[in-house]
Amino acid sequence: MTYTLKLYEADTSEAQRNAAERRFRDALETSLGDESLVAPVYSAYQRIVATYGEAPAPDSLTAAEREVFDQWQAAEAAALAATFGPHRYMGDAMYEIGV
């Protein structure tokens, strides 16, 4: 299963955006272990969030759901840090993953 990635960042050139997308992909794939794991883990994470919300109570998830939830959040944090650095919580930069 493959995935697409699109970064939305104001005031960047196409070359800068492409480089940022590569950093995001590299960090995400490294954190999850392989490119082939991004789409299924993200899809599972999306189902968990749709069922339990953005911040589910720890005891509401099964062990497997908690593992997927935690893995995705860690991978996402690593990708955001690699892409946007210490200012990742400031500004209008956003991303979209398609599966």
Model features per residue range: what roles?
Residues 1-23:
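Short, extreme N-terminal segment that most often corresponds to the first beta-strand
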Residues 16-18, 36-37, 89:
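Short, solvent-exposed secondary-structure capping/transition elements
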Residues 29-78:
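Short, intrinsically disordered low-complexity segments
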